[in-house]
C-alpha cells in the first residue's frame, strides 16, 4: 500500500456517458471516512489486524482497535511498531476488553467497523452497524473445500491437503476443511495423505510440525465433530483422539475418510488439524458438494490442466479460489479478499479493499457556457427537449453514440 496507495486513491476525472458527455465533467475524490473501529480475533492476532489497520490508515483514517480479550498483547505490539515507524501516537489507539467493550465500540460513533471473527458475533456486529447506519466489513467463518481432479499431480495435491488442513493447527479461516476426490484416484490419494501425515511431530516445546489447540473451547468443538463423524460411519486412519501424552490442549494431525454431508465435520467450521476426505464420482459431483455449504470464504482446485482448474474455480460459490495452492489469497495484496454467504460481507486487500475505507465523493462541473434551461417553462423549451429526445433516442446510430 505504501507503493500503490497513492495511485489507488488518486483523484480520478471521468467524462459522463450519454447526452451528458458534452456538458459535464466528473471528478472522483476518495475521502477518508473518519474513525474506523477494528475488532480482531485470537487466531492470527497480528496478521489479521495489521492488514485492515494498514489499509484504514493509508486511506487517511484514525483507528480504534479492540483485539480479542485472550490475545491482548498482540495489539500492544502492533501499536509499538506503529509508533516506532513514526505514526502519530493518537492516530491508532487500542482498547482492551471482552465482548462488552466491542459492543461499546460499535455504538461509540465510529464511521466504519472492520470485524474478523465468528458468524454469530458477526451477525450482531452487522445488526449494530445497520442500526447506526455505518458501513462494515465482516470476515467470518469458513469451511473451505478442496477439489482434486482426476488428472491432478497426486504428490502435490496430497501435500496441499496436509498443509491446508494442518497449518496453524487448523486455526485458519481459509484452512482446508473438506477434500473431495474422484473414485478413480481416491485410494492412491488417501495413501499419499496418510504417508505424509504419519511422520508429523507434535510437541509442547522445541521444533514440531503441529502445535497446540488454542484453548478448551476449540478442543471441545474438534472432539464433538470427531465424535459425531465416528457415530455416523467415518473411518479414522491417523490420529483422531486428543493427545493426552502432552500437558495442555493437543490434538494430533488427523486423517478421516468415509465422511459425508450428514456429519458436522463436513458442515460446520471445525478449526482443527483434520483432513476430511470424501469420495465422489467425478469433478461435477465434487463441485456440487463444494458449493453445498452455508460458508463461502475460499476454496482450491488441483489439476494439471490450468484452464480447467480456472473454469472449475469460477463455478465455486466462494469469495476467492486458488488453483494448485492453498489459502494464498490473503497473502496476495492485489487480490480482494472476502467471503460470500455466511463467510462475510465486503472485502479487504487491493484497490477494492483500501477504497472500502473511503467515501467516494464526486464533484460534477457543468462545462457549458450558458444555463441549460429552467423556469419558467415555455412551449419553445418543451419543444426543444422533445426534439432532442427524438433525435438522440430515435436514431440507432446516435443512440449507440450517446447512450
Give each language-model segment a name.
Residues 106-107, 140-142, 172-174, 207, ...:
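Short glycine-enriched loop/turn motifs at secondary-structure junctions
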Residues 14-156, 280, 397:
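Rossmann-like NAD(P) dinucleotide-binding subdomain of oxidoreductase/dehydrogenase enzymes
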